[in-house]
């Protein structure tokens, strides 16, 4: 079966044909680093992690880039509130991001460009747009002239005449800015410096970049003028991705991306999970209650384009589902020796003509239907669980040891494609240099006091020292820190 992708741009499923055979260039709009990530962020990062894993499993060489927005009003507001700098806030929450993603078993991108590290490319792109007549300066600001780009609205399907200015919370429509714009739909590419805010030299004076221009510059600098797949949450379709297209395609005259993919939002009580609504659950709070693999399973059981309804009952059901898969994944470690397997390895390649592999691929090839792929995994896991129970009670199995080994290897490898892994039982190794629980709690309290005193360097030192000794700290909302031994 041919891999098909639902393309937001064309509003239909299309066969996947990369620009260069065997290679995929993929860009994901990342987070604004001003707070801890919530389940909505987890879904976005996890979905594209598994899309990337699947493309690699299908034989593609994937170059995957995900950005950090580290210049933003929300970051500046937090820095002012804490009496620290924009850089301190960004660095702290970038570290927290990686801690959360590591626990969710999300692979690192090939690069994480930041807005502050891409300023030269941003200024070049703004200058190009101005020279080509798509942008205009106004008292130190530079605005993109939306009506100058005839294809504006092609991604979202929105027409300017049908829109009300300011429909998106990310469009700047403060009175002073509105007066500078030639059209209320125009958006800022470069913002003039304001007192007390970071700023950089530019042809238009001191200032900082607008939000939309950052991604256009990063894509161009890291992946080229046209890429294979551009991804992000569905809340970014308009205006962010629409504006990206307008900027990039006006500058180059080429399509920004061949395929546009968007994941649905996580919802709570019918509303989008977001910090602004206060209805969010942070990843670290969630992982204090649920196994990371259960959270992965919860996210993958709903098609990536559909909304995901978050309820405790749904997580509990995913936990039960993970226990079933986990039993199957551990089957070889628990029963392999008893079955006389000559070599306990899950790495032997599975046959391409294996019907279970074909069922899995046929499901996921249909616009990344991970739920369909999971159905195949559950079928294998339940068979292995049944055979394990028979072996325990009757000292025999209904299926041959050779067939069971093939089933187990198939389950392990297909689960790895989805980032689902169960660690084999092993004897606990002492890795904490003899630290007692009380000593660990004392160090955590010292770190808490250092952070309250805005001494984030000391707090980071204590955390890193504990990590080197096999102690992982999990910061949660409300100033609570939990820990576990690796």
Curated annotation (Swiss-Prot):
Pfam families: DALR_2, tRNA-synt_1e
Disulfide bonds: none
GO cellular component: cytosol
Localization (cell): Cytoplasm
Sequence motif: 'HIGH' region, positions: 31-41
Gene3D superfamilies in the cross-refs: Cysteine-tRNA ligase, C-terminal anti-codon recognition domain, HUPs
Keywords of this entry: Aminoacyl-tRNA synthetase, ATP-binding, Cytoplasm, Ligase, Metal-binding, Nucleotide-binding, Protein biosynthesis, Zinc
Residues the record lists as binding ATP: 275
Primary location: cytoplasm
Cofactor(s) it depends on: Zn(2+)
SUPFAM superfamilies: Anticodon-binding domain of a subclass of class I aminoacyl-tRNA synthetases, Nucleotidylyl transferase
EC number from the UniProt entry: 6.1.1.16
Catalyzed reactions per annotation: tRNA(Cys) + L-cysteine + ATP = L-cysteinyl-tRNA(Cys) + AMP + diphosphate
One GO term of the biological process aspect: cysteinyl-tRNA aminoacylation
Family: Belongs to the class-I aminoacyl-tRNA synthetase family.
Alphabetical list of PANTHER family matching this protein: CYSTEINE--TRNA LIGASE, CYTOPLASMIC (PTHR10890:SF3), CYSTEINYL-TRNA SYNTHETASE (PTHR10890)
NCBIfam families assigned: cysS
Protein's name in the database: Cysteine--tRNA ligase
Organism whose genome encodes this protein: Gloeothece citriformis (strain PCC 7424) (Cyanothece sp. (strain PCC 7424))
């Amino acid at each position: 079966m041919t891999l098909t992708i639902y393309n937001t741009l064309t509003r239909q499923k299309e066969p996947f044909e990369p620009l260069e055979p065997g290679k995929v260039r993929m860009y994901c709009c990342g987070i604004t680093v001003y707070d801890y990530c919530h389940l909505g962020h987890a879904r976005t990062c996890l979905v594209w992690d598994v899309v990337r894993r699947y493309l690699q499993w299908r034989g593609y060489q994937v170059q995957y880039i995900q950005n950090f927005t580290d210049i933003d009003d929300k970051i500046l507001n937090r820095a002012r509130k804490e009496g620290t700098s924009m850089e301190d806030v960004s660095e702290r929450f970038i570290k927290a991001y990686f801690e959360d993603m590591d626990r969710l078993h999300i692979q690192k991108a090939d690069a994480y460009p930041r807005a502050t590290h891409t300023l030269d490319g941003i200024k070049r792109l703004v200058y190009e747009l101005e020279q080509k007549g798509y942008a205009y300066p106004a008292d130190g600001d530079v605005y993109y002239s939306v009506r100058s780009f005839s294809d504006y609205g092609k991604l979202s399907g929105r027409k300017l005449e049908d829109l009300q200015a300011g429909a998106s919370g990310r469009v700047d429509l403060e009175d002073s800015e509105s007066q500078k714009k030639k059209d209320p739909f125009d958006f800022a590419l470069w913002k003039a410096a304001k007192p007390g805010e970071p700023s950089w030299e530019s042809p238009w004076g001191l200032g900082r970049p607008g939000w939309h221009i950052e991604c256009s510059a990063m894509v161009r600098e890291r992946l080229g003028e046209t890429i294979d797949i551009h991804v992000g949450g569905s809340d970014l379709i308009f205006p962010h991705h629409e504006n990206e297209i307008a900027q990039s395609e006006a500058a180059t005259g080429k399509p920004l991306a061949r395929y546009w993919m968007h994941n649905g939002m996580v919802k709570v009580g019918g509303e989008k999970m977001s910090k602004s609504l206060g209805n969010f659950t942070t990843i670290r709070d969630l992982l204090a209650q649920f196994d990371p693999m259960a959270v992965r399973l919860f996210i993958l059981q709903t098609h990536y384009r559909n909304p995901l309804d978050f309820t405790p009952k749904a997580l509990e059901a995913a936990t039960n589902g993970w226990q079933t898969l986990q039993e199957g994944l551990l089957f070889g470690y628990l029963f392999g020796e008893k079955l006389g397997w000559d070599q306990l390895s899950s790495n032997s390649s599975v046959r391409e003509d294996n019907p279970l592999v074909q069922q899995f691929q046929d499901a996921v090839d249909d616009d990344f239907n991970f739920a369909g792929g999971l159905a195949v995994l559950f079928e294998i896991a339940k068979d292995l669980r049944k055979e394990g129970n028979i072996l325990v009670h009757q000292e025999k199995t209904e299926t041959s040891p050779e067939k069971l080994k093939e089933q187990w290897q198939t389950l392990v490898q297909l689960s790895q494609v989805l980032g689902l892994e169960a660690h084999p039982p092993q004897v606990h190794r002492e890795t904490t240099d003899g630290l007692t629980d009380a000593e660990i709690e004392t160090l955590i309290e010292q770190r808490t006091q250092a952070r309250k005193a805005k001494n984030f360097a000391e707090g980071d030192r204590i955390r890193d020292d504990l990590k080197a000794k096999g102690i992982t700290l999990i910061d949660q909302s409300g100033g609570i820190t939990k820990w576990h031994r690796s």
